[in-house]
Structure formats: C-alpha cells, structure tokens
C-alpha cells in the first residue's frame, strides 16, 4: 500500500519543526481538537503536509470557498505527486434553489447548471476513498450537504476480472442499476456502449480514459484501459472496479420500500392539510407527489429526487443525512483552514436551508421529509469528526475553547517580521496619508487603504486622484475577473494605491504592499474587530518595509489587543532573526501561489486582447458561434486543471460574445 510522501525542496525551518512535531504527537496521542496558530506567510500548508506524512491517515482539508480550496489543492498536489489529492466542491456553476414566496404567490422552480468536470472530480474523490488510504480531499463547506449512502455506493460497485464467469447482459443490467446510460454513438462520462462481445464503459470519475471488457461466451476474456480520444490502448488490467455514475444510487429493493414509505407519508400529510382546511395545498401536494412516484416506478429517478433522500436511504425522520464525511474511514483526520471564517459558515448552513423549506412544506409543494435533505447541523457535524486541527492566524473563541493544545507558528521562513504599527489622530489624516503614500511611490511600493463605508471609499478615491495619485477603488459589485485584473494591475504598477472596504478576501497577500492604512480604526464593529484588524495588519507582512497606520482618536479594546498581539509576534520574530543571523527578504517570487490570475503577464497579452476585439467585431454570426464553442472547450480544460480564474475569465468572455448574437 502506498504511503504519503512529501516531495519538496523545502526543509522545515523556524517554528515549523516544533509545530510539526507537536501536532503529530497530539494526533498520535488521540487528542480530538488542536489549533495551529500560524501567521500569514509562515508556511502553514507545508506544516499540514508534513503532519499528514507523519501520521499516514486519510485526510480531509476544509476551506471556506472554491477559490481557496483550488489553491490548497494545487499546493497539496505539488507536495504529494505520488498520492491521491482530490477536490470536492459544489458542482453547480449556477444554482437557484426551489422556493415559494407566499406574499406574492410565487413558486420558483429549482434551476441549476452542473459543471461536468467538477462532478467528475467529486466522483474521483469518493471512489479514491474506497480504493486506497493515501487520500487527501480538499473540500469546500458543500461537503456537509446530503450525499447518497456510502453503503449503497460501495455495494453497487461493479468488480470485474479476466476469467470471471459473467454474462455480458448481466453486466449491462448492473451498469443500468448504477445509473450508467447506454449510448453507442455519443460516448462520454457515465455512459457505456456495446459492440458484439465488446463492452466499453466510461467511468464517472474519468475524463479521458475508458475500460474495454471483451467477452468469450459467458467468460470475461480480457480487460483493457484505452484513451477515449485516440483509441490507443494504455494497458491491460487484471482487475477493475467501476463505481456508480451517481452518488444517489440505491438498490431496487430499497427503491420499492422508498415508494411505499413516500405513499404512506403522503396520505398522512394530506389528512393533516385537509383537517386544517388547506384544500388547495392538499391538491397541489397530491398532484406533484403522485407524479414523482410514477417517475420513480418507471424510470428509477425523478426531478428533485434529493427531496426523497430520507426514504431512499431508509433513515428515520430527523436523522442526519449522509455526507462526504461518511465516506471516510473512522480514523481520518481533518484540517479546517481559515477556521475563524469556516466554522461560522458551517454553523449557518442548516438554518438558511430550513427557512427556505418552511414555505415549501407549509404550502403543499413538498412533503415534510424534504427537511431531511439538508446540510448537517453544527452538532451533527461535530459528532462526525474524528480528530481535527484548526488552522488560522486568528483562531476564534470556539477553536481556542475546544483545543487541547494551541501550537504557534510565528517565524516566517523568509525572516519577514510582522509590520510596525502607528496610531495617528484623525485630524489631518488625509494630508498625513498622502505624505506616506508619496514615500511609498518613490520606492516603487504599493499601498492598501481600508475604509468603513462605500461613500467614504468613493470620496477618498476621487480626492486622491485630484492630487495626482494613481488610485483605484475595489467594491463588492466588481466581479471575480475584474477583481483579479485590478490586483494584477496593482502588482504591475499601473496604479499605486488600492482603496476598499473589505480587503480580507483571498488574493490580497501582495509582496509589493508596504503600507496598509486603516481609516476609522476606532469605530467598533465586525470590520474593526480584533480578528479583522489582525488579518488586515497581515496584509503588510510580505514586505520588508511593511507598516500599518491606524487613524483613530482613541484606542479601542480591539485595537489594543491587535497591537499587543502584533508586537508580541514581532518581538519573537526579531529575536529569532538576530539569534540566527537572518536578514528579512521581501517575497520576490511566489506570484503564482498568491492567485493564478494575478500573474504579471507581459504587455503582449493586452495587445492580443485589443486585436481580438477588432477581429470579433468583423466576424459573422456563424463565426462567432464557432468561436464560442472553441472557448467553451478551453474553459472546460482549465476547469479540469483547477485553473478556475482562467476558466471564469473565458466564461465572462463567452457571455460578452453571446450578447453579440
């Protein structure tokens, strides 16, 4: 069995060796909760990788959004090239949940667009857990949402070997039960085709490789793996396990039981509604549910099948749904990255889902069992955990209370220290700020300014422009691609100052930034809490000249705590550097690690984009349609490679082109 093996030029330095040793010891001793308090840029991902290598256990890494999950997945793939590093996030490109608004009598049907590539990656993740132990899955919070039963998923797996006595038609019937679809012409993921005694299966977890099973009578003669595009044989296989094409598969016996159970619940609910005089709601519910039952009897599935997941899995009412966590072996470990954001997000999921379903159940659009197709409650989530390491520069009260040990990682491998903090009175703040900006511009460095309101940010941006400073304002209405473009332009030096309200989102750890100015630092609220202030201060921690100026007339509790904590860390870092003769260096490279779309691309790209605009304007309608198809293929390829910013950039370009049709 393969073991986890970190492949890297880095050696643990600074606080890393101690952190790795202590966290490993905690896991081996069976401690349930630990916290890695690691400052920005201290190499937390590398520490996590070394701990995984030490304990050799299947691992789930939880991130609070898709972009961060993709970045972590890329980093772990670099550290573990010989192991299975998988990616599990929501597969919806677009999702409008089913809802009912009683005030206007408006029913909104569920509408969604599923990203086929991400669905493939999800299948790859779950199948890897049943095939091997050297598995790391990087997931977003969508992993606490309902997924099919792991028991049914495993029981319906098709295991084939050469020499096995198995009838071809029997294998076909099994594939159909696993929700594979027969299509002899359009051969793609989740489908199979038959040519005489040859059966070709395209597994749900693959993009480019399929399995060819050759029969001789009732015996499997040969199994080969081949490239779907070229038809070239990759190799012969002595054994192959085909996993179901859907996570919501169930056996025919369970389906029959589920239909009976749905009918019983329907009768009970209809009696309740009629006794309350809700005749319209009762009629609506009966009509919709009977149609779904018919579909389940005839086809084995129906639209919105997930709303009947409790019946399909045979769970009692109110019991927790099956999720990705149930697919892991009992001894798995979990890292919760940026836990100060991720934990509150996990807490909020259940209530949001329940509030939306209340109206659907009350007005006869769904049976009460629809409540059981839901994310886990926070208490259920806690029960499913085995051993957890919270990872954050600013752990929240929950993490600190739960953890048996808090391991600090304060020393950065680059020798960089936390920035110096200055508090300046509000009177004359703008003139003072302009003076500080000019000092940075002379050194070819950049400045981030955070304000509390949109109005203040807009006024400040206009004022700075009027005095000749090259400044841009980044607000919440800016889409992902434009946001990446702004960050890239800041790094390229097309402007020097970026003004924003919330500068804590991913992608803003920029080495060129040597000054962070916090206006209204003494106005208490979530943007000026201790956690937010420490995170904002960290934005200046990648430059050797890093400095933070807080503009305030008084020092609040949150400010004092943030200043004290930063000074404490700074003292430890400076002492370590002096003791070991380390001279801090601004991060020069690592642009790719910050965020893919901010890479300093040469000016050639811009020339190309302007030429492309001219060409598109002269294209015929048919040529634009063909160009859109080409771009869609490129977009899918980038999605496979986890280059989501590039894929999103192409998606936005496709939207613009479709407007021209």
Curated annotation (Swiss-Prot):
Keyword ATP-binding: yes
Superkingdom to which the source organism belongs: Bacteria
Protein residues bound to ATP: 38-45
Compartments where found: Cytoplasm
GO molecular function, one term: excinuclease ABC activity
Function recorded in the entry: The UvrABC repair system catalyzes the recognition and processing of DNA lesions. A damage recognition complex composed of 2 UvrA and 2 UvrB subunits scans DNA for abnormalities. Upon binding of the UvrA(2)B(2) complex to a putative damaged site, the DNA wraps around one UvrB monomer. DNA wrap is dependent on ATP binding by UvrB and probably causes local melting of the DNA helix, facilitating insertion of UvrB beta-hairpin between the DNA strands. Then UvrB probes one DNA strand for the presence of a lesion.
UniProt subunit comment: Forms a heterotetramer with UvrA during the search for lesions. Interacts with UvrC in an incision complex.
Domains as described in the record: The beta-hairpin motif is involved in DNA binding.
Entry protein name: UvrABC system protein B
Encoding gene (name): uvrB
């Amino acid at each position: 069995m393969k073991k986890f093996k970190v492949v890297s030029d880095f050696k643990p330095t600074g606080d890393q060796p101690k952190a790795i040793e202590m966290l490993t010891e905690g896991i081996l001793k069976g401690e349930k909760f630990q916290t890695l308090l690691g400052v920005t840029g201290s190499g937390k991902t590398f520490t996590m990788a070394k701990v995984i290598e030490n304990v050799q256990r299947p691992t789930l890494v939880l991130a609070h959004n898709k972009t961060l999950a993709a970045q972590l997945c890329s980093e772990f793939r670099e550290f573990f090239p010989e192991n299975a590093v998988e990616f599990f996030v929501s597969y919806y490109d677009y999702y409008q949940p089913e809802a009912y608004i009683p005030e206007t009598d408006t029913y909104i049907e569920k509408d969604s667009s599923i990203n086929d590539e991400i669905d493939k990656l999800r299948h790859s993740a779950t199948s890897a857990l049943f095939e091997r132990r050297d598995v790391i899955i990087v997931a977003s919070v969508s992993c606490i949402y309902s997924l099919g039963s792991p028991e049914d998923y495993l029981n319906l797996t098709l295991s084939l070997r050469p020499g096995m006595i198995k009838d071809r038609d029997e294998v076909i019937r099994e594939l159909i039960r696993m929700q594979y679809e027969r299509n002899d012409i359009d051969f793609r993921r989740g489908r199979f085709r038959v040519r005489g005694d040859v059966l070709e299966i395209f597994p749900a977890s693959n993009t480019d490789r399929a399995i060819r099973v050759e029969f001789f009578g009732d015996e499997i003669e040969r199994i080969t793996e081949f490239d779907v595009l070229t038809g070239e044989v990759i190799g012969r296989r002595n054994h192959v396990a085909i996993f179901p094409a859907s996570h919501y598969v169930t056996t025919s016996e369970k389906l029959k039981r589920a239909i009976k159970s749905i009918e019983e619940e329907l009768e009970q609910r209809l009696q309740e509604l009629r006794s309350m005089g809700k005749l319209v709601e009762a009629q609506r519910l009966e009509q919709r549910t009977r149609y779904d039952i018919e579909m389940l009897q005839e086809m084995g599935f129906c639209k919105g099948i997930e709303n009947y997941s409790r019946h399909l899995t045979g769970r009692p009412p109110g019991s927790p749904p099956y999720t990705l966590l149930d697919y892991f072996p009992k001894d798995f470990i979990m890292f919760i990255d940026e836990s100060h954001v991720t934990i509150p997000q996990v807490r909020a999921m259940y209530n949001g889902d329940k509030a939306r379903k209340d109206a659907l159940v009350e007005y006869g659009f769904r049976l009460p069992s629809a409540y059981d197709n839901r994310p886990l409650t926070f208490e259920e989530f806690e029960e499913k955990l085995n051993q957890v390491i919270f990872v954050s520069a600013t752990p929240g009260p929950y993490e600190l209370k739960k953890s048996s040990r808090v391991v600090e990682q304060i020393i950065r491998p680059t020798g960089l220290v936390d920035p110096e903090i200055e508090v300046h009175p509000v009177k004359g703040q703008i003139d003072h700020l302009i003076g500080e900006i000019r000092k940075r511009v002379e050194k070819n460095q950049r400045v981030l300014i955070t304000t509390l309101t949109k109005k203040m940010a807009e006024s400040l941006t206009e004022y700075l422009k009027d005095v000749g400073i090259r400044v841009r304002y980044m607000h919440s209405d800016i889409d992902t691609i434009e946001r990446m473009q702004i960050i890239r332009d800041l790094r390229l030096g097309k402007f020097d100052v970026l003004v924003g309200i919330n500068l804590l989102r991913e992608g803003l750890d920029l080495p060129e930034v040597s000054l962070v100015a916090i206006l209204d630092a003494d106005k208490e609220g979530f943007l000026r809490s201790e956690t937010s202030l420490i995170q904002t201060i960290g934005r200046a921690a990648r430059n050797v000249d890093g400095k933070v100026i807080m503009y305030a007339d008084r020092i609040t509790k949150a400010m004092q705590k943030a200043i004290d904590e930063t000074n404490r860390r700074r003292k430890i870092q400076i002492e370590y550097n002096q003791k070991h003769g380390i001279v801090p260096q601004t991060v020069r490279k690592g642009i790719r690690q910050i965020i893919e779309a901010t890479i300093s691309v040469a000016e050639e790209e811009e020339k190309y984009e302007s030429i492309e605009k001219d060409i598109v304007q002269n294209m015929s309608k048919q040529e634009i349609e063909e160009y859109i198809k080409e771009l869609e293929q490129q977009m899918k390829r980038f999605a496979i490679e986890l280059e989501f910013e590039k894929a999103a950039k192409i998606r936005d370009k496709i939207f613009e082109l479709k407007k021209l049709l």
